[in-house]
Amino acid sequence: MIPWLPDDSDSAPFPPTRLALGPDSEAPGLLCAGGQLSVARLRMAYRLGIFPWYSQGQPVLWWSTDPRMVLQVAQFRLHRSLKKTLRRFLVTPGNEVRIDSAFADVIDHCSRTPREGQDGTWIVPEVKAAYVALHRAGSAHSFETWVDGELVGGLYGVNIGRMFYGESMFARRTDASKIALAALVAFCLAHEIAWIDCQMETEHLASLGAQPVPRAQFEAHLRRVVDLPAPKDWFYDPSSWARLGDRGPGQPSPSA
């Protein structure tokens, strides 16, 4: 039996993450169930490296996976093809990267994007509402790819201190989500956010430089960064691309 959180308290503590179900169980990383998706509860969870993930009809399920998939932004792999795509994107009229201009739309698109190996979505209506509330409280943000006024890709996640926790992404055009991810990496480099939590290991994330780290190492990093000042200005700064250094798209001329 896994522990249950009370539904009438935002301050009841989570169980120690070492009690999460192990790799040989049917649900590796499952820590506890129950409780509410309030802003206070979500902030408490993310500070500890715990995240909610469940399907329609299930109770709220809380997870602490081991290992944890992490993108250390200094290790981000901007492949040649994506670098070329970025250069073209940045000089084409009507193309934009935005931050937090359409958070609710981003999470809605993420909820409707089919995922290989998943039947339905974990971004159920109460999850959408909870993260929109977290966004309004200043702790959840979206990075968005726009073409001619149309939202064509993006991602959203949670920020606590100097940590960013990626939640989900979508693309309605080729590489649109990768452009948003590159913008997030550039933002993190500019604001001294060293790690982006990716939660689950996938080949796609690994191809971009993400690696699994032991839970103990992940939690030690959280303890160092979650109480540091969070970024205050969540807006797109074109100069942030320079933070990618030689890997970045540079400042191409219109003829590039």
Swiss-Prot record:
Disulfide bond positions: none
One Pfam family from the record: Leu_Phe_trans
Disordered, as annotated region: 1-21
Coiled coil (UniProt feature): none
Domain of life: Bacteria
EC number, UniProt record: 2.3.2.6
Catalytic activity as recorded in UniProt: N-terminal L-lysyl-[protein] + L-leucyl-tRNA(Leu) = N-terminal L-leucyl-L-lysyl-[protein] + tRNA(Leu) + H(+); N-terminal L-arginyl-[protein] + L-leucyl-tRNA(Leu) = N-terminal L-leucyl-L-arginyl-[protein] + tRNA(Leu) + H(+); L-phenylalanyl-tRNA(Phe) + an N-terminal L-alpha-aminoacyl-[protein] = an N-terminal L-phenylalanyl-L-alpha-aminoacyl-[protein] + tRNA(Phe)
GO CC terms, sorted: cytoplasm
GO molecular function: leucyl-tRNA--protein transferase activity
Subcellular location(s) of the protein: Cytoplasm
Function description: Functions in the N-end rule pathway of protein degradation where it conjugates Leu, Phe and, less efficiently, Met from aminoacyl-tRNAs to the N-termini of proteins containing an N-terminal arginine or lysine.
Family indicated by similarity: Belongs to the L/F-transferase family.
Protein name (record): Leucyl/phenylalanyl-tRNA--protein transferase
Organism field: Leptothrix cholodnii (strain ATCC 51168 / LMG 8142 / SP-6) (Leptothrix discophora (strain SP-6))
Lineage: Bacteria, Pseudomonadati, Pseudomonadota, Betaproteobacteria, Burkholderiales
